[in-house]
Amino acid sequence: MNKKMTEQEGIRHQKIEELKKLKTEPFGKNFTCSHTIENIILNYQNIDQEWFEENKVNVKIAGRIILKRGQGKAGFLHLQDFNFKIQVYLRSDLLGDAFLLYQNCDLGDIVGIKGFLFKTKTKELTIKALDFIHLTKSLKPLPDKFHGLQNREEMRKKRYLDLMVNEKSRQVFLTRSLIIKSIRNFFDNEGFLEVETPILQPSLGGASAKPFITSHNALNSDFYLRIATELPLKKLIVGGMPKVYEIGRIFRNEGMDATHNPEFSTIEAYQAYSDIQGMMELTQKCLQYICQTVLKSLEINYQNKKISFQTFQKISMTDAIKKETGIDFQKKLSQETCLQLAKQHDINVMSHFSQGHIIEVFFEKYVEHKLIQPTFIYGHPLEISPLAKKNLNNPRFTDRFELFIAGKEFVNAFSELNDPIEQEKRFLNQLKQKELGDDEACEMDYDFLDALSYGMPPTGGLGMGIDRIVMLLTDTPNIRDVILFPHFKNKNIIKKK
């Protein structure tokens, strides 16, 4: 703990000794509440004072002091639990010696109150205190509600303070919990089985991403933190589980911006005997369920944009590009022609780029940011979809879709490739891509190929980013504001030379 104290912190430290003189433990013990502040507000807020005069409601609550006013023999406190606050009225003649504890308390202290409910002349629901129990001394003053913690980075680093003083943040994380609960309820109700698969993986697969690498001492081997849950979940489909899903953390050792964080949460789900169409229907149904459950509406506002989940649009990737640029990539163009088109449109072509990669970059540059309403983009090039089935009508493309909302990707799904011979060829091509400089290419996963060799039924699968769903439904523009503890460079760690 930093030994340099402010004047206020020094005074608070002195009060520890004052509490001990009053035979009060500064950091308290257990305290059993009869109600939460939320219970009291929701159940008694709209009741008149006349009712309280005829019906005495005794309460025993605990909370953090966020306001203190009054002098002499009476005063008021505002106590706050996570999301609700209530006024407390305290008088020396009712509290006796406990009134000294009230007089010595500071903002931020955690206390218990025993008393009964009444309404003030201004009709504010209030507890008249009969006992004041000190529970925890706060050794640092709370940030000023209006002037403190204005720096966004500081709020993210000290989320505990942000939650104390910022109602918006509290609502975001309550909503996040509701969203995850609604996702779980949806898939449970659809007959999916929730499973858990390893975070540490011996091989890299299931997505195109740079991994975090760690060492397993007991096995004397390097492992990856998973970049997706796809391959182990599909092994469970091979094993006979017809519908599975997993909600969990994914790790990708890549850049950070307003919509990307290296550690993030996803839901992945796989259904035997389904396909791309089944996944589209499941995705739309799931998002509509989440919106209705959490917001009670299919219409939302996100960053001054009105978005409706009533209907979902659908367009192929090549048609979307043609609409914006006039270029028809559905036609079979030569690599030289594609490279020339990329040059004409100021698209940087990397050494490993195939036609499929060029098509993807055209989409990202000219189409993606314009997809505001929920839109399924389907028909991705084969080269960028190593785990998806080829489209039967045009094998240059796959039965894959991504869902875009507000200009960002939210869902990735496809008819899963279940041909082990074709999958091995795709993995070999990924290795060639890696040799050409694609550090996000998949590795060869022999155990997954072995599983496919026993036969995986035709399967549909989807992956959805939970953090982005939370951003969307809470009207939050930065992913770091929907993650409780985002990462920061630790300036206190001294690196070994």
From Swiss-Prot:
Keyword Amino-acid biosynthesis in record: no
Localization: Cytoplasm
Enzyme Commission number(s) from the entry: 6.1.1.6
UniProt keyword Metal-binding, yes or no: yes
Gene Ontology CC annotation, any one: cytosol
Cofactor: Mg(2+)
Cystine pairs: none
Chain sites annotated for binding Mg(2+) 2: 409
InterPro entries, A to Z: Aa-tRNA-synt_II, aa-tRNA-synth_II, aa-tRNA-synth_II/BPL/LPL, Lys-tRNA-ligase_II, Lys-tRNA-ligase_II_N, Lys-tRNA-synth_II_C, NA-bd_OB-fold, NA-bd_OB_tRNA
Residues that hold Mg(2+) 1 according to the record: 402, 409
Ranges annotated as spanning the membrane: none
GO biological process annotation, one example: lysyl-tRNA aminoacylation
Catalytic function, reaction form: tRNA(Lys) + L-lysine + ATP = L-lysyl-tRNA(Lys) + AMP + diphosphate
GO molecular function terms listed in the Swiss-Prot or TrEMBL record: ATP binding; lysine-tRNA ligase activity; magnesium ion binding; tRNA binding
Keywords attached to this entry: Aminoacyl-tRNA synthetase, ATP-binding, Cytoplasm, Ligase, Magnesium, Metal-binding, Nucleotide-binding, Protein biosynthesis
Record's cofactor remark: Binds 3 Mg(2+) ions per subunit.
Pfam families, sorted: tRNA-synt_2, tRNA_anti-codon
Subunit structure: Homodimer.
Family per record: Belongs to the class-II aminoacyl-tRNA synthetase family.
Protein's name in the database: Lysine--tRNA ligase
Organism: Phytoplasma australiense
